[in-house]
Swiss-Prot record:
It comes from the Eukaryota. PANTHER family: LEPTIN. Its main location: secreted. It comes from Mus musculus (Mouse). Keywords: Diabetes mellitus, Disulfide bond, Obesity, Secreted, Signal. This is Leptin. Gene3D superfamilies: 1.20.1250.10. It holds the Pfam family Leptin. It is found in: Secreted.
Length: 167
């Protein structure tokens, strides 16, 4: 009689441990799909093809460049900066991309949680001091450079997800 609860518990535990492994792979797949979707959206904006992600533009040094090895924390911080820059732009082209970045950051937080990592909250990031001045002086260049660098960063993140990044 006392074996019955133990057997139920073991059966339930085996079920729960199996169920838990599947969603993490789904989250990782969803993350990769969303990255590919964002890259496609950037490609659909025709004027982003005219600038290299490596090109230096005065005043835009706060926009992250390419990072070959990224942790989940660094990915989140980088995407937070891009999200902040894109939401500061008045262009209608980038609104959906900024929303997609928020969703992508949420997926990265789920991946980090599955690895028992805690990502620092970056929602209250201060806007870079030079952003307003740069937006007034060269709105078009800021959008082009930000989207070009974001595309490169997303490609790096996509590659890192294949090798299971650290916290």
């Amino acid at each position: 009689m006392c074996w019955r609860p133990l057997c139920r518990f073991l059966w339930l535990w085996s079920y729960l441990s199996y169920v838990q492994a599947v969603p993490i792979q789904k989250v990782q797949d969803d993350t990769k799909t969303l990255i590919k979707t964002i890259v496609t959206r950037i490609n659909d904006i025709s004027h982003t093809q005219s600038v290299s992600a490596k090109q230096r533009v005065t005043g835009l040094d706060f926009i992250p460049g390419l990072h070959p090895i990224l942790s989940l924390s660094k990915m989140d911080q980088t995407l937070a900066v891009y999200q902040q820059v894109l939401t500061s732009l008045p262009s209608q082209n980038v609104l959906q991309i900024a929303n997609d970045l928020e969703n992508l950051r949420d997926l990265l937080h789920l991946l980090a949680f599955s690895k028992s990592c805690s990502l620092p909250q970056t929602s209250g990031l201060q806007k870079p001091e030079s952003l307003d001045g740069v937006l007034e002086a060269s709105l078009y260049s800021t959008e082009v450079v930000a989207l070009s660098r974001l595309q490169g960063s997303l490609q790096d993140i996509l590659q890192q997800l294949d090798v299971s990044p650290e916290c």
